[in-house]
Amino acid sequence: MQNFVLQLLADLAKYDLDGIILDRCRYDDYGLESDFSDISKQKFEEYIGETVANFPADIMAPGTDELPSEQPAYFKKWLEFRVKVIHDFIVKARDKVKSVNNNIKFGVYVGAWYSTYYTSGVNWASPKYNTSTYYPKWATADYKNYGYADHLDYIFLGAYASVNNIYGSGEWTMEGFCKNGRELLQGDVPFAGGPDIGNSTGWTDGGQSAKIPDAIDACINNSDGFFAFDLCHIKMYDYWNAFKTGFDKYLESIEE
């Protein structure tokens, strides 16, 4: 499957594009329950240099979908292995794109909720960010080695907070997501944070034009750009004027 996707990227890179961005480059959204295949078991055992006698129980009990209070012997090492798998694919994908056209920018989309993004098998932070210092319950000392920010030309962070949690300093506020993102990325890559204006709490039925300028303000002033998920929602709920208002306010602020 990896080779198939890499060939798709090579074919795509032959076109005159400004950039290529990967989405859903992660483990399935069943999170911790995804991919206990024979090949994953084999690759994991090769990685740790040991045989896992009780698989998957020595990693996690079947049905585990959140951080267990009592962790089996290989639980944290399994999380490390998963982020290595995604890290290594990102490196291959970038190399494949650049081998065809070195001028194409290469990036990814990720959810900004880093504190629980280990369930998706992704460490999008800089390898300079020592994850285990801040999240010792689930990150090994080597987890940081598989941060892939330094392999990207840009990254989109989904700051997908609810309509009433735009400003703030922690996760699950748009502003907080972007502020945390800057710390996590350590300057390795420019990033754009932005809201989900069609699916997050309070956004699903439209009618939130008044909130759009604040969402733009919170994200664009705490990151290196702005993006919104998704264009179809802007059109569906006729948010065009609201977006123009938000961007005009930003442009006025940087001209002062």
Regions found by a protein language model. Name each.
Residues 138-256:
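Substrate-binding cleft of secreted/luminal carbohydrate-active enzymes
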Residues 1-151, 158-160:
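Polysaccharide-binding and catalytic clefts of secreted carbohydrate-active enzymes
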